């Protein structure tokens, strides 16, 4: 059922929605195959420090010092950094969908995502996100992470929209639930087809009327 108030704004996650994930377990497993480090040790150290990195409290260089380069390695810091950034790849159909909906309906598009500074800066530039995203509410910029309500409220304040005007798209069901509790419309993204169909129920369709 379409909302009684027109949707003016799309809040959208980046990892596993517009682009692939940046540095999750699958990426660390891939790094193990390339660099041959102790995956269990890296995973444990990453679990203890990555939240601080995503909140903008430590740099990528500091994160790597604590997680990988706390001991001598046969590979360089630069090689690991380049590998990490290279894991980001586009999800072309989702990028096309969001661009097309913005063009057709004049939507504000706001990225609301958890990410580290070096990752998100690379992703914004590499994939041309500024061409269609109006503002970026990123954990490392605002020092708050989903599912904390603070980051959602900041997104609403900065975009200057009411919750009922917003459709929020995220691959994490919990993050969608938080947005819905704040009054936004939510879509749990699991595939392009299901998200496109869900957006259409809010009056955001690319089909000719």
Where are these regions (language model features)?
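Asp-based, Mg2+/Mn2+-dependent phosphohydrolase catalytic module
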Residues: 1-12, 116-117, 121-209
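Active-site neighborhood of HAD-like aspartate-dependent phosphohydrolases
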Residues: 2-45, 182
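Short, acidic loop-to-helix structural element flanking the phosphoryl-transfer center
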Residues: 6, 69, 78-110, 121, ...
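Generic structural signal for small/hydrophobic residues in well-ordered secondary structure
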Residues: 13-16, 56, 101, 111, ...
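Alpha-helical elements of Rossmann-like donor-binding domains used by nucleotide-donor carbohydrate transfer enzymes
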Residues: 26-30, 48, 62, 66, ...
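Short, surface-exposed acidic
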Residues: 35-45, 72-82, 204-209
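A metal-dependent, Asp-based hydrolase signature
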Residues: 51-81
């Amino acid at each position: 059922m379409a909302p009684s108030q027109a949707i003016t704004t799309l809040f959208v996650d980046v990892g596993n929605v517009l682009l692939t994930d940046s540095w999750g377990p699958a990426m660390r497993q891939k790094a193990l195959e390339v660099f041959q480090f102790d995956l269990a040790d890296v995973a444990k150290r990453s679990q203890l420090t990555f939240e601080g990195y995503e909140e903008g409290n430590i740099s990528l260089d500091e994160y790597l010092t604590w997680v990988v380069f706390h001991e001598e390695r046969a590979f360089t810091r630069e090689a690991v950094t380049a590998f990490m950034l290279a894991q980001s790849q586009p999800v072309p159909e989702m990028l096309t969908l969001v661009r097309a909906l913005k063009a057709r309906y004049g939507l504000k598009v706001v990225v609301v995502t958890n990410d580290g500074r070096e990752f998100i800066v690379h992703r914004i530039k590499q994939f041309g996100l500024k061409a269609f995203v109006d503002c970026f509410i990123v954990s490392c910029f605002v020092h708050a992470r989903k599912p904390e309500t603070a980051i959602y409220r900041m997104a609403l304040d900065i975009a200057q929209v009411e919750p009922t005007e917003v459709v929020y798209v995220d691959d994490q069901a919990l993050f969608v639930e938080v947005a819905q509790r704040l009054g936004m419309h939510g879509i749990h993204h699991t595939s392009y087809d299901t998200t496109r169909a869900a957006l259409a129920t809010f009056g955001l369709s690319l089909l000719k009327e």
